[in-house]
């Protein structure tokens, strides 16, 4: 099966269900507190993918009746779903395609004034943050979920993604500062002439 360019959301959901059975709401909550830092998805997208995963036979749904509460559907990964997840994880033929709207806009920012661009770069780190609630909150959420991890070694990889996000934010701040410095130097040279 070819994975290059294929939407990754379904594999993210399979990965979450591989940790344990969940309802659609629980998947959305865990997704929001973990994968959403690097792979954004709307609730409607997740539910649409769940339907496709069930149709493919990669997950199954068990209807559970509850007293004094609405019934719920508990979702679990099937053996076929586990095989698909592992095949996707082992596939290293496809290159991760980088589509970065920030870089596209930066490439053409010469159409804006230096002052507008200085403002753009000053606001960039806050606007492009990976962790809107702060890195400490992200670390705390990751630590909380790690308590429920079926295997501490698997939870280590969650930490790796948090670390990547922290380093990305640091890189973005440093890069923005350098862009501002360069633009201010150009601005000062132009006013000196």
Residue ranges and their predicted role:
Residues 87-134:
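Amphipathic alpha-helical dimerization/coiled-coil segments
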Residues 118, 125, 132, 139, ...:
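Heptad-repeat amphipathic alpha-helical coiled-coil interaction surface used
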Residues 178-193:
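Long amphipathic alpha-helical coiled-coil segments
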